[in-house]
Amino acid sequence: MPKVSSLFVLLFFLVFSGIVSANGSQALDAQDAARTSNASVSGRWIVNADVFGTPLFYQMHLKEEAGKLMGDFAGDKLEGTITGNSIHFVAKDEQGGTEECTATVKDGTVSGTIVFTDAGDAAHPNAHKFTATIAPQRRVGVPQRHEFTPTTFYRQFSAANKPVLTVSPGDTVHTTTVDAGGTDEKGLTRVLGGNPETGPFYVETAMPGDTLVVQLTRVRLNRDWAMSDDAIVPRGLDTDLAVKMKDGGKSVRWHLDTAHGVATLEKPSEHLAHYSVPLRPMLGCVATAPPPAASAPGTGDSGGFGGNMDFNEVVEGATIYLPVRTPGALLYVGDGHAAQGDGELNGNALETSMDVEFTVDVIPGKRVPGPRVESATHIMAMGLDGSIDDAFRNATANMAAWLEEKYALTPPEVAEVLGTSAEYKVSEVADRNAGVVLKINKEHLQTLTSKSAM
């Protein structure tokens, strides 16, 4: 009996110890899972909110420390908590409005509800369902070069158009564009006119709130003729000149002599028999897609997304910075010009097809307010609006923001730099929006200390 009793005690001890050990292990596993879940919350998230049936995208930065959340939602500072897989935070904007989030984390996705409260209408908050995924990481490896032959061309800068090619930051794309009338390098009309575009190109990791960088490494002619006209657009006419130009608007064909680098009229009038202009191939259109909530603008239009900017310094060697407002950026290029004077005064420049190569990159978490261009000698900020006055203001504000961001200048310092170094160009008068570009020679900025990449 004593031996049996001792054996029973021993067995009981072993079984009981195993149960305790198993329960303890399960508890530790649960704690580890919770810690793992919490750790996965820290980072940059892309929020897709269903706002009355329309997807709106936001960036959200979260940092978790000991159950507390910090960061920002769409740039608004947030504070909150995380308990297990449950998240709650409140973000506040400068006007006193709030975004309150209640959500759960599961399988790498945050989903729940965001309540938007406008400080001016606090009695009527709006609650919307959302999902969020961690922002994709840049692909590791050697950048790729893509040969893309377009078969479809689009006449809207739309987020709904299916991407024709997916590329990664650092990749290069070689392609072609048709002219503004839809005619290709062989003289074949491929699509209805109105600046049909090549693209859109989906750029991996580019998310709303980022900046897309497009470096034009090749902008070359691929045929020997271009079309223009003999009119002057209404913005360039006073009453007397309008009367004199009443018979204008006829199509004019130009010969493009790449061997000598000039364009000449194929059928010149008497006084223009020996007239020629230097060839300077450019792209009239470079654009990212506006957000899905916005009406898709036609490819003859322009705005903060870029578009039909018709700026004659968007040439080989230029770098264009554009805001990203939809996942993948959705980059469009087109509307090649063999040459163009400031403003595109005829309404049509020397319209032609083009051989184009570009390299893309992404600046994460930083979105430019409007199109910017950089050359070897200048930085250039664009303003595009319904009047030249408003475009002038937009260009000035765009450049002021650039100087503040890149060089940490104060507003008075910005004024001193602009007042002594600004160069203004009227870039566009032919379309709905006028364009004004503020340029600064980089030599004037050499003594300033750069604080950021752009």
Q: Where is each model-derived feature located?
A:
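Bacterial N-terminal signal peptides
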Residues: F8-S21
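Conserved mixed alpha/beta catalytic, RNA-binding, or beta-rich assembly cores of soluble enzyme
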Residues: L279-N308, N312-D389
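N-terminal, Lys/Arg-enriched amphipathic/low-complexity engagement segments
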Residues: V140-T189
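Central antiparallel beta-sheet cores of small beta-barrel/beta-sandwich binding domains
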Residues: L28-N126
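Short, Lys/Arg- and Gly-enriched loop/turn segments at beta-strand edges
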Residues: A180-V191, V219-D229, G328-A338, S427-A430
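Intrinsically disordered, low-complexity linker/loop segments enriched in Gly/Pro
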Residues: L221-V314
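Short, structured beta-strand/loop micro-motifs enriched in basic residues and often containing a Trp
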Residues: T149-S158, R190-E197, P297-F305
